[in-house]
Amino acid sequence: MPERFKWEETERPQSLNSRVKEAFHSPASLKPRLELAISRTEAQAQRLDQTAQRLSERDKSLFAKIIEAYSKHDAQRANVLASELAEIRKTQKTVMHARLALEQIVLRLKTVTELGDMVGALAPIVGVLRTIKGSIVGVLPDAGKELEQIGTMLNGIIMDAGQTTGLTLNFDTANEDARSILTEAATVAEQKMKDQFPELPSVMPVSANKAEGKT
C-alpha cells in the first residue's frame, strides 16, 4: 500500500454538517477500510494456496498409484483412480483460477491512490469476487463466505466514495473489466495446469474375465 494516499494531501475548512458526514464517508475513513479489504483478500489467497498444495500432493499420490496399476496390468483399478484424479484436477483448476484472480484483485486494490479512482477500480472487483465465490463455495465454503463479505465491504466503499465525489458507476465498463480479469486468470490457470501436472494416461480396456474377477 502507498504510505500516503493522494486524497489526504489537502485539507479544507469544513462546516459542522460536513464534518459529521465525513465521519461516515470521508476519504480518511475509506483508507483503513480499503486496507482491511486488501488484508482479507490476501488471507483468502493464502488459504487457496494451502488448498492447492494439498490437492497437488493428492494428485501426485493418485498418479503414482495409476502408474503402478498400469504396470500390474490392473486396468480396472487404473481407470477408477484415473477418474478420481480427473475430478481432483477439475478442483485444482477451479482453485488455481480463483487464486490468480485474487492476485489480480490485490494488485488493483493496491494501486488505488486517489478517491476518484475508487468507483471505477472497485466495481469490477466486486463482480470478480461474486464469480469466484460461486465457483469455490462447494470446495471451500468458509472462503466463499469470506469473499462474499469482502465484496459487501467493497460495495460500501464504492457507495461512500460515490457520494463524496459525485461520480457514477459505468456498469458496462465494470462488467467488461471483470470479464477481462476472469478471462486472464482462466488462461493462466489452464497453462499452469498443463505445465505442472503430467497428462493422464489413456483409459485401459478392462477384459471381461478380469472385470468378473473383481466383482
Q: Language-model segments: what does each one mean?
A:
Residues 73:
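Residue-level signature of catalytic and energy-coupling elements of molecular machines
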Residues 65-69:
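Hydrophobic side-chain positions on well-ordered alpha-helices
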Residues 1-50, 119-215:
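Long C-terminal interaction segments enriched in charged/acidic composition
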Residues 54-62:
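Extended, amphipathic, non-transmembrane alpha-helical segments
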Residues 77-78:
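Solenoid-repeat scaffolds in large eukaryotic assemblies
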Residues 109-121:
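A cross-kingdom feature marking charged/low-complexity
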Residues 88-108:
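Amphipathic alpha-helical coiled-coil segments
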